[in-house]
Structures are given as structure tokens and as C-alpha cells.
């Protein structure tokens, strides 16, 4: 759960249900169902769709909200992330790593709120850096782990 108020803690039980149902990584997605919750800017949604497309292309699995930080993990995912977790924009890259290593990744629909405080680390020129960096990181993770499972 982010500390900026975007994630409604009332959805935590939904993520826990996915973990109890066999997911190693559960992601709260604002795109699984249409809600009246906060939706990010058009350009950010384009970027999210690009990352979703890239993950599906390289892993064969669909993740509708790969930038969501509203997540829960089981022991297997925690063990993996303790050994290897990106420290710069980690969400999409860590999803690719988990999927390439055969960990089940599932999403639950959640409603996101508008940021209550702080500023996004992604904006202006940094958004270009973010998209290039994360795209290359996903490609590299998928290439390095292409035969793993």
C-alpha cells in the first residue's frame, strides 16, 4: 500500500484471497473493471498499456495494471524479491521476473484514489527515462530468464 492515499486499504482482503487461492503475487488493478475511482492521465494510461502489451508479448500472460504498487506477496515471491528486486521503478520489472520464474501472478479489481500528498516521481522528462528504462529492464529480465521455470 502506498503512503500517498491512492490505495484504499479496504481492498487488502481481496489481495489476500488471491494469495490464499494460489497466487504468489497479487496486484490491485484499476483496469480490470470500470470504476468511478481516480484514473491517471491519458499519457500515463498509454504508458501502462504499452507495458501491459510488452509483458504479454514476452511472457504470454496478461497484467492490466503493471505499474500498480498495491500488491501482496506470498513466501515464494518474498524469497525471490529478497534476492532480486529492482530499486528503480520496480513494479513492472518485478512482475516480469516473477512470471518468467513461474510464480503465479493474479490481479483483483480495486478503486484507486487521487494522490492525497506528495508528488509523482514520474513526470516531464523523467517519464521518457522511465519508459525507456522499464522497457529495457523487462526485455532484459525476460531474455535472461527465457528458459527458466
Q: Where on the chain are the PLM-derived regions?
A:
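Catalytic donor-sugar/metal-binding loop of nucleotide-sugar-dependent glycosyltransferases
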Residues: 61-62, 83-86, 95-113
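Conserved residues at the C-terminal ends of beta-strands
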Residues: 1, 29, 111
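DNA-recognition element of transcription regulators
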Residues: 92
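The conserved acidic donor/metal-binding loop of glycosyltransferases
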Residues: 2-6
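Residues at helix-coil transition
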Residues: 20, 56-59, 100, 140-144
Amino acid at each position: 500500500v502506498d503512503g500517498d492515499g491512492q490505495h484504499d486499504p479496504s481492498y487488502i482482503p481481496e489481495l489476500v484471497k488471491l494469495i490464499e487461492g494460489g497466487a504468489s503475487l497479487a496486484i490491485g488493478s484499476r483496469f480490470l473493471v470500470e470504476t468511478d475511482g481516480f484514473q491517471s492521465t491519458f499519457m500515463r494510461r498509454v504508458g501502462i498499456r504499452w507495458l501491459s502489451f510488452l509483458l504479454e508479448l514476452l511472457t504470454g500472460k496478461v497484467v492490466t495494471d503493471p505499474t500498480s504498487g498495491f500488491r501482496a506477496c506470498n513466501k515464494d515471491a518474498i524469497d525471490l524479491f529478497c534476492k532480486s528486486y529492482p530499486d528503480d521503478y520496480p513494479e513492472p520489472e518485478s512482475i516480469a521476473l516473477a512470471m518468467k520464474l513461474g510464480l503465479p501472478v493474479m490481479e483483483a479489481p480495486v478503486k484507486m484514489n487521487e494522490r492525497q500528498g506528495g508528488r509523482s516521481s514520474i513526470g516531464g522528462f523523467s517519464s521518457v527515462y522511465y519508459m525507456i528504462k522499464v522497457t529495457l529492464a523487462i526485455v532484459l529480465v525476460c531474455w535472461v530468464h527465457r528458459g527458466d521455470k
